[in-house]
From Swiss-Prot:
Pfam family for this entry, one: O-FucT
Organism: Arabidopsis thaliana
Keyword Glycosyltransferase among record annotations: yes
Designated name of the protein: O-fucosyltransferase 7
Assigned EC number: 2.4.1.-
Principal localisation: membrane
């Protein structure tokens, strides 16, 4: 009997031990699963309000908007002051909805884009979580917001003394800046501005009219309290005296009030032969500077067809996730003008020399491309851009929108860049030929599409500081200092050359150096730079930072500096 009892007791003990062991193992398995899943709960919180604001603003930024609405819609929401790494308990649902926000439009990709983005490329926001802030977060805006309303003493336009005709010159963004300057000049000299004529004779030979590129009626109405604008000269004024005048570059208030305004005593129609850089960047009355910003960021909006197509391109880029807009300035005319030929064949370099020699209005003919490059005066090559993006830490599946005309050398010239970044997109890849049909053969309209996609990008990087790069950077500053990385071309080419010569065996050191250099070149708020020391005359003005590259302090005010972040 005693043996049976002992046997029963032992059996009971063993059973309890087994049950306890099973419970412990179950608990360990449960904990192991959660240890694996937990990192997903710590994914960075994507502020949907921020992206929704920007997606909606593709439409809004081209509307005539009040200073109050600019403050509300264009500055970062207060919620954006919450750290990107937020409470793990609440982040899982927000993360899932954030992902759907970025990938639910994949059906918008046109049929000829043969492969849809892989799941890894769509979810690029989750790769390298600790680096999310470094790669995508905008710099602190320090509570700077647009402030473009005129002072209380600002009056309606005075009685017009005559008509100002304008022949713009250059590409899209050079013409845009010139038009905005002419609006301000018309105010200074009490002129009625006739809707400007776009450049049809320069390198691009674009036949677009003002109304093809811009919303003409909106332009006229938006400026009605500043100047009088008409579509064309009235009939029956053939007898009026006319004059063609080359306004002096970078001229100030006194030049226009005295020398130009005095011409009304003799002439009733003044035609400005050129529009580029005719007004000084600095030392103008605050109301004139604010008028330039109202003209640029409110009145001069793109035509309906361009805005609609631009919105579509942005939506299609957003379907791939967060994206970089890369202004890759490597077109034939750019290389010919600048004399830059690094990485080109002998025949290609010779072709560019012929173009430069045969283009009459390009004054400098003999250019040493090697010297230009080492001084940082050349656009980065596609290969150099690829090294830059890699050094900054962007993964190979990062969507990159190429904002450019026809790349010199075609697709083969992009091989080095594509070997590092496979998701290279462009308007030609995002849209069908039928969708782009009305814009083709019109370089100004195609550039306007690139402008919209660049403004709305998560990160903007120009390979060269030309007119578009400056215009986009200034607009992004105006919209809340969106992340804009300005490459130090001089430093980059020297570091890249070290790799090419084999002088640097460890590429990581080069990458670290490039990364370090660009930590302070990401579009943070700062005052516009003045002239370079030691410069005089026209060269002094040219060395200044362009007004439209950085409209601070004239058109951006700090709201409650004590709360700046």
């Amino acid at each position: 009997m005693r043996r049976r009892r002992k046997t029963v007791v032992v059996a009971v003990v063993i059973r309890r031990v087994l049950i306890w062991a099973i419970c412990v193992m179950t608990l360990l398995c449960f904990l192991t699963v959660h240890i694996y899943v937990a990192p997903f709960n710590r994914l960075p919180k994507l502020h949907l309000n921020h992206h929704n604001t920007r997606r909606g603003y593709i439409i809004d930024y081209n509307k005539s908007i009040t200073e109050q609405s600019l403050t509300r819609n264009l500055s970062r929401p207060e919620s954006n002051e919450i750290p990107l790494i937020s409470n793990p308990k609440t982040n899982e649902i927000q993360y899932q909805s954030s992902i759907s926000e970025h990938i639910n439009n994949t059906e918008l990709v046109p049929p000829h884009v043969s492969t849809s983005p892989s799941s890894s490329s769509k979810l690029n926001i989750t790769s390298g979580i600790p680096d999310f802030d470094k790669l995508w977060k905008h710099p602190p805006n320090r509570n700077f917001v647009p402030c473009v309303s005129p002072n209380p003493s600002y009056t309606s336009p005075l009685e017009s003394r005559g008509y100002l005709l304008v022949h713009t010159n250059g590409g899209l963004n050079q013409m845009r800046a010139g038009i905005c300057d002419m609006v301000a000049i018309a105010r200074i000299i009490n002129a009625t501005l006739v809707v400007p004529e776009l450049d049809k004779r320069s390198f691009w030979q674009d036949t677009s009219k003002f109304s093809d590129v811009f919303d003409e009626d909106h332009f006229i109405n938006a400026l009605s309290k500043d100047i009088r604008v008409i579509k064309k000269l009235p009939k029956g004024i053939d007898g009026l005296t006319k004059v063609v005048k080359h306004f002096k570059s970078y001229s100030g208030l006194s030049y226009y009030q005295n020398e130009i305004a005095s011409m009304w005593d003799e002439y009733k129609v003044i035609r400005a032969a050129k529009s580029d850089s005719r007004l000084a960047n600095n030392n103008l009355p605050p109301d004139i500077q604010k008028l330039r910003c109202r003209a640029c960021y409110e009145a001069l909006r793109f035509s309906t067809k361009i805005r609609s197509m631009g919105e579509l391109l942005v939506d299609r880029m957003r379907s791939y996730g967060l994206y970089i807009a890369l202004h890759l300035r490597f077109e034939k005319e750019m290389l010919a003008f600048s004399g830059c030929n690094h990485g080109l064949s002998a025949s290609e370099a010779a072709e560019l020399r012929r173009i430069r020699k045969n283009t009459a209005y390009w004054k400098v003919k003999d250019i040493d491309g090697r010297v230009q490059r080492l001084k940082g005066y050349c656009p980065l090559t596609p290969k150099e851009v690829g090294i830059l993006l890699t050094a900054l830490g962007y993964s190979s599946d990062t969507p990159v929108y190429i904002a450019a005309g026809e790349i010199y050398g075609g697709e083969s010239r992009l091989a080095d860049l594509r070997s590092r970044f496979s998701m290279l997109m462009s308007k030609e890849k995002l849209a069908t030929r039928e969708e782009l049909k009305t814009f083709m053969n019109h370089s100004t309209q195609m550039a306007a599409l690139d402008y919209i996609v660049s403004i709305e990008s998560d990160v903007f990087i120009p390979s060269y500081s030309g007119n578009m790069a400056r215009a986009v950077e200034g607009h992004r500053r105006f919209l809340g200092h969106r992340k804009t990385i300005s490459p130090d071309r001089k430093a980059i080419v020297r570091l890249v050359d070290r790799i090419g010569r084999g002088a640097e065996k460890d590429n990581r050191k080069v990458y670290e150096r490039i990364n370090e250099i660009h930590k302070t070149r990401q579009g943070s708020p700062r005052r516009r730079k003045g002239p370079a020391s030691g410069t005089k005359g026209l060269e002094r003005h040219r060395s200044e930072e362009s007004f439209y590259e950085n409209p601070l302090p004239d058109c951006l005010c700090q709201r409650d500096p004590s709360k700046a972040r």
